[in-house]
């Protein structure tokens, strides 16, 4: 009897995997970043901008990680600002700056500085031996609360092994690709505060694994302490600069009217802003490629020296007394203070992120006038968070960008209209709101101005943390620049009370393709029509070297005019100079193998995602839709294949099979370009626009009936 009682009282081993492995249909709250009209976005996994996985946006909550005992050593978030301080901007055709724009720049600069200090202080709240992780922390700087060493599946807990068994994945495949499995788990379990690391093969006993794990935790803790010390030194130095230094006059033209204007300087030159935090700004007359970023010029005795930052096609003529030193992917050139170089904080499995310090992938690096003191990066750094390669950039146009956070004020002034209460500009429409994990989208009507009584989509985005501010401004800038019939039209953006950004876009009354799939069955010719329209948008993006990186059915919309458009550019990246990135971001079911394998990826990731979307449209659901772990692991190891022997695909045409096969190539170099896919025989079977217009009433009726049915079920 005593054994029975003790058995009943025994706590069941917790299984955190059930929190993130469910499909989006079963657990909407797991999405990290909602699209305009639907949930289901993820960003992260051991890397990336917001590297980390299923992180729902719960308001005002914090997560507590115990750092004492039972592997709960370490933990906490580390705030690591960028140090590049030279950015470039394109100005309006006007040569004067309005007084309101100037005052806004000044106000934004002061506010952003105080905001960064606020975030920095609120992100690490340590009481005793416990870290409290605020949900608003920048997850780029994630330091795990628990590190688990895994060499084979036997090293997982009992409940985790049971969960893996339920996925029906061959044991040999799991053990042979344990690194891919750990990548998947790190991507999905980031919010749980857990980091899985692969144990070296020479560590075979528990003692060795424990020692290895302790070494990793110590490295993480030392890294955290070093970064905090560097932060303090950096802030002290900036404080000295505020009280000393010669300020130059700033002449920058700011576009705040929200129209889709691609501003260019009259003479084709770009102004270089140096140390925008301290208002110490130097400019030159040479043509500057903004993507060629230089290191921070934190020198108390700058005395208005001209520092020319050029690309390969520009002449660099420096007559200053400072020595010239070239930054490389393995060296950071420092000034007379111990700076927080981006690569010092962010070195990881690849040197790609160091390209930000060397001016992209041009091979020559950025040439700066700096002191000769250099700090070499470790060739074998400890486990550290990895960011997307453009983590400190705000897009201007392909190949040109602002440096973040130093030039955040200029980007904000150019992209966003400051409005104390933007709600007075709109009235709410019938479809009041659609909530996403990172924002709420409303159907609204403008009450005056150019778009009076025009229904638009209004997306409210939180704008408090540093990461959110960068992502919001980058998404706005990209969408503002893009102009294509198959990309949703950007209208304007407003800042409310320094806490929210309201982004206004065209309203798509037909909803997302994902909504349509859940209520309606498409035949192949309509699938081909939608695919053709999306290929046109991808062809346009490829011509600009921009990868969307979150292509999925809930980011494709249709309207009553049979127009199909791509939305949500939050994970998009300009690859003009970077060429490739290493970053697990996007949505689990649509992620390409190279991303899952944590390898460099480029424009071809969108072709893989398109193949999954096409399969979803004809089948009604994505492959392995019940489990994110299984879907990602199999995609990253054996790929996705479709067979005519299956019941659901026995009626598919040969053209469809071939289209899916070429899109879902494991090797990204073998995937065709959007232009090549537009010539594929499957696209030739597409319905006409007139035929699609005839289909829309049935589609909308099915959607309405489904909404009414859900409403009755919720009562």
From Swiss-Prot:
It is an enzyme of class 2 (transferase). Its EC number is 2.7.11.1. Residues 207-241 form a coiled coil. The keyword Coiled coil applies. Pfam families: Pkinase. InterPro entries: Kinase-like_dom_sf, PAK3-like, Prot_kinase_dom, Ser-Thr/Tyr_kinase_cat_dom, Ser/Thr_kinase_AS. The active site is at 550 (proton acceptor). It catalyses: L-seryl-[protein] + ATP = O-phospho-L-seryl-[protein] + ADP + H(+); L-threonyl-[protein] + ATP = O-phospho-L-threonyl-[protein] + ADP + H(+). GO terms for cellular component: cytoplasm. GO terms for molecular function: ATP binding; metal ion binding; protein serine kinase activity; protein serine/threonine kinase activity. Gene3D superfamilies: Transferase(Phosphotransferase) domain 1 (1.10.510.10). Its cofactor is Mg(2+). The keyword DNA repair does not apply. Keywords: ATP-binding, Coiled coil, Kinase, Magnesium, Metal-binding, Nucleotide-binding, Repeat, Serine/threonine-protein kinase, Transferase. ATP binds at residues 433-441, 459. Residues 427-683 form the Protein kinase domain. Residues 1-125, 228-330, 366-385 are annotated as: Disordered. Residues 54-70, 80-125, 367-378 have a biased composition (Low complexity). Residues 42-53 have a biased composition (Gly residues). Belongs to the protein kinase superfamily. STE Ser/Thr protein kinase family. STE20 subfamily. This is Probable serine/threonine-protein kinase mkcE.
């Amino acid at each position: 009897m005593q054994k029975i009682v003790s058995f009943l009282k025994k706590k069941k081993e917790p299984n955190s995997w059930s929190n993130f492995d469910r499909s989006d249909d079963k657990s909407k709250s797991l999405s990290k970043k909602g699209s305009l009209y639907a949930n289901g976005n993820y960003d992260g996994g051991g890397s990336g901008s917001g590297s980390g996985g299923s992180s729902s946006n719960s308001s005002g909550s914090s997560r507590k990680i115990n750092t004492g005992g039972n592997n709960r050593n370490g933990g906490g978030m580390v705030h690591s600002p960028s140090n590049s301080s030279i950015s470039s901007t394109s100005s309006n055709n006007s040569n004067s700056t309005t007084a309101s724009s100037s005052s806004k720049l000044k106000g934004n600069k002061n506010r952003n500085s105080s905001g960064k200090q606020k975030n920095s202080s609120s992100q690490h709240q340590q009481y005793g031996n416990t870290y409290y992780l605020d949900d608003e922390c920048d997850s780029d700087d994630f330091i795990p609360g628990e590190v688990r060493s895994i060499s084979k599946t036997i090293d997982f807990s009992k409940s985790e092994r049971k969960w893996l068994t339920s996925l029906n994945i061959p044991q040999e495949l799991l053990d042979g690709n344990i690194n891919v499995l750990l990548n998947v788990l790190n991507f999905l379990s980031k919010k749980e505060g857990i980091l899985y690391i692969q144990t070296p093969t020479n560590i075979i006993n528990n003692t060795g694994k424990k020692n290895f794990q302790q070494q990793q935790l110590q490295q993480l803790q030392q890294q955290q302490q070093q970064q905090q010390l560097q932060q303090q030194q950096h802030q002290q130095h900036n404080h000295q600069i505020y009280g000393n230094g010669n300020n130059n006059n700033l002449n920058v033209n700011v576009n705040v009217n929200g129209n889709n204007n691609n501003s260019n300087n009259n003479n084709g030159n770009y102004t270089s802003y140096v140390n925008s935090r301290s208002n110490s700004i130097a400019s030159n007359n040479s043509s500057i490629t903004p993507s060629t970023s230089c290191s921070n010029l934190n020198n108390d005795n700058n005395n208005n020296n001209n520092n020319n930052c050029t690309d390969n096609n520009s002449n660099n003529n420096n007559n200053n007394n400072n020595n010239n030193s070239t930054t490389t992917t393995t060296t950071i050139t420092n000034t007379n203070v111990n700076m927080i170089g981006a690569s010092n904080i962010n070195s990881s499995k690849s040197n790609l992120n160091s390209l930000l310090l060397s001016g992209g992938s041009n091979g020559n690096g950025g040439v700066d006038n700096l002191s000769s003191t250099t700090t070499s990066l470790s060739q074998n750094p400890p486990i550290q968070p990895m960011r997307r390669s453009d983590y400190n950039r705000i897009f201007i146009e392909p190949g040109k960008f602002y440096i973040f956070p130093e030039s955040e004020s200029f980007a904000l002034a150019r992209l966003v209209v400051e409005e104390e209460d933007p709600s007075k500009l709109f009235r709410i429409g019938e479809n009041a709101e659609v909530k996403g994990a990172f924002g709420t989208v409303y159907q609204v009507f403008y009450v005056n101005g150019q778009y009076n009584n025009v229904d638009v989509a209004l997306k409210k985005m939180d704008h408090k943390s540093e990461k959110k501010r960068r992502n919001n401004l980058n998404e706005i800038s990209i969408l503002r620049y893009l102009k294509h019939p198959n990309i949703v039209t950007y209208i304007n953006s407003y800042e409310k009370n320094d806490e929210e950004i309201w982004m206004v876009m065209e309203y798509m009354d037909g909803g997302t393709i994902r909504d349509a799939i859940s209520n309606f069955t498409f035949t192949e010719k309509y699938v081909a029509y939608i695919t053709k329209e999306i290929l046109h948008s991808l062809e346009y993006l490829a011509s600009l070297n921009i990868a969307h990186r979150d292509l999925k059915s809930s980011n494709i919309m249709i309207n009553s005019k049979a127009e199909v458009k791509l939305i949500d550019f939050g994970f998009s990246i300009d690859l003009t100079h970077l060429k490739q990135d290493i970053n697990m971001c996007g949505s689990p079911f649509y992620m390409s193998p190279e991303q899952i394998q944590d390898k460099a990826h480029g424009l071809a990731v969108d072709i893989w995602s398109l193949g999954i979307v096409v399969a979803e449209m004809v089948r009604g659901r994505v492959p392995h839709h019940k489990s994110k772990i299984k879907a990602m692991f199999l995609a990253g190891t054996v790929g996705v294949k479709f067979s005519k022997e299956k019941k659901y695909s026995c009626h598919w045409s040969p053209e469809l099979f071939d289209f899916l096969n070429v899109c879902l190539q494991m090797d990204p170099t073998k995937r065709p370009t959007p232009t090549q896919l537009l010539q594929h025989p499957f696209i030739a079977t597409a319905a006409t626009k007139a035929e699609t217009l005839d289909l829309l009433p049935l589609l909308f009726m099915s959607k309405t009936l489904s909404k009414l049915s859900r409403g009755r079920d919720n009562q």
